Amino acid sequence: VPPGGLTXAQXFTIQHIXMT
């Protein structure tokens, strides 16, 4: 998924998964 296509909600979820 392109970073430019991430929404606030998606980015927030992706950041949490990554951090886990």
Curated annotation (Swiss-Prot):
This is Non-secretory ribonuclease. Its EC number is 4.6.1.18. Keywords: Endonuclease, Hydrolase, Lyase, Lysosome, Nuclease. It is an enzyme of class 4 (lyase). Its main location: other. The keyword Nucleus does not apply. It is found in: Lysosome; Cytoplasmic granule. Interacts with and forms a tight 1:1 complex with RNH1. Dimerization of two such complexes may occur. It comes from Sus scrofa (Pig). The active site is at H16 (proton acceptor). It catalyses: an [RNA] containing cytidine + H2O = an [RNA]-3'-cytidine-3'-phosphate + a 5'-hydroxy-ribonucleotide-3'-[RNA]; an [RNA] containing uridine + H2O = an [RNA]-3'-uridine-3'-phosphate + a 5'-hydroxy-ribonucleotide-3'-[RNA]. Belongs to the pancreatic ribonuclease family. One of its GO terms (molecular function) is lyase activity. It comes from the Eukaryota. GO terms for cellular component: lysosome. This is a non-secretory ribonuclease. It is a pyrimidine specific nuclease with a slight preference for U. Cytotoxin and helminthotoxin. Possesses a wide variety of biological activities.
